[in-house]
Amino acid sequence: MSIDFQQLPHAGIRSLIPYVPGKSIEELAKEKGITDIIKLASNENPLGCSPLALSAIQTMSSHYIATYPSPWNHPLMSKLASYLKVKPEQLFLSNGSDYLFNILLNCFALHTDRHILTHDYAFSTYAIQANSLQIPINSVPIGHNWEVNITDIVNACNQQTGIIFIANPNNPTGMLIQQEEIKYLLEQIPKSTLLVLDEAYYEFAASQLTVNSLDWLEEHPNLVVTRTFSKIYGMAGLRLGYAIANPSIINILKRVQLPFIVNQVALAAAYAAIDDDDFIQSSLKMNNEGMSQLQAGFNELNIKYLHSSCNFLTFDCEEDSIALYNYLLDNGIIVRPLHAYKMNNFIRVTIGTKEQNSRFLTALKNFYL
């Protein structure tokens, strides 16, 4: 008897549209037979990783690699806590931010009568993970200016709202919600509702913020802030994210975590990277200059784009973006079309080096002119 394994999972899995990452350089090289490729699709740091992190990796002993990691006893815990001005018991280390979202859903929404709340054009993994667990998710529409109306979030929240997911700044729009609005949201929602503030791009937006969200943790124990070493630190390949929250929340997460969720290499690299302020400042300088370079290029071509507080720009092709996307691929440039977000006319491009940005803008001009 033939078994249709597609029908064995629950309905949430069967109907799931999986997250598809940006095309890799290796994938495009295989498809097109070209070697001169730049990737501006996944908001990675074009400068690579911190030299201090790389040195820490290169000098690791084989014994360190051969032993199981112990994240909670690693010196990174106290060092990161000191850097963030929080207590070690407020930290939870994770194999990337995605695992954080999954474990939060499992702990605070799964097998309850509670739902998840976010907004349209939020980071897609929130809905993907909620749907995979068959947790109802409600999405609040945003305005024509692509900005989130916090009052609408407040009005949509009730006692059955288990978790609110907000990325600030948001991917893929790049929009930043001012801290006064986030504080207002915290003051209005039920104390039993977690606000998960996804700050993956925090370092790129920090200069625009008047308050650090971590300052609210004591007053609002239902706040969970997530950050990552993937973006500004250039460590996306090592998968290290972390949550900062009330110790009681952290304790619950530790009860259900998978064993050895953070590897030894990531721990050593992050421990070193925290000290590399020169690399952080160089990355921010390059990003600011690259942002201005791309904006000037878009303005010259009369291309509309969304204001961004991240390390990428999302722009409007004014028609389905697939033609431009394929043209850029043919020219060895990988960007990110946003059909998965139902933004069919939009493309997201990572801010690259000056040379990478110039190559992208030249290809853009050749396509449109």
Curated annotation (Swiss-Prot):
One BP term from GO:
L-histidine biosynthetic process
The entry's keywords: Amino-acid biosynthesis, Aminotransferase, Histidine biosynthesis, Pyridoxal phosphate, Transferase
Q: Which residues carry this modification: N6-(pyridoxal phosphate)lysine?
A: K231
InterPro entries noted in UniProt: Aminotransferase_I/II_large, HisP_aminotrans, HistidinolP_aminotransfase, PyrdxlP-dep_Trfase, PyrdxlP-dep_Trfase_major, PyrdxlP-dep_Trfase_small
Give the EC number. Answer: 2.6.1.9
Q: Name one GO molecular function term.
A: histidinol-phosphate transaminase activity
Q: In which pathway does it act?
A: Amino-acid biosynthesis; L-histidine biosynthesis; L-histidine from 5-phospho-alpha-D-ribose 1-diphosphate: step 7/9
The record describes its quaternary structure and partners as: Homodimer.
List, alphabetically, the HAMAP family matched.
HisC_aminotrans_2 (MF_01023)
| Protein name in the entry | Histidinol-phosphate aminotransferase 2
Q: Which organism is it from?
A: Legionella pneumophila (strain Paris)
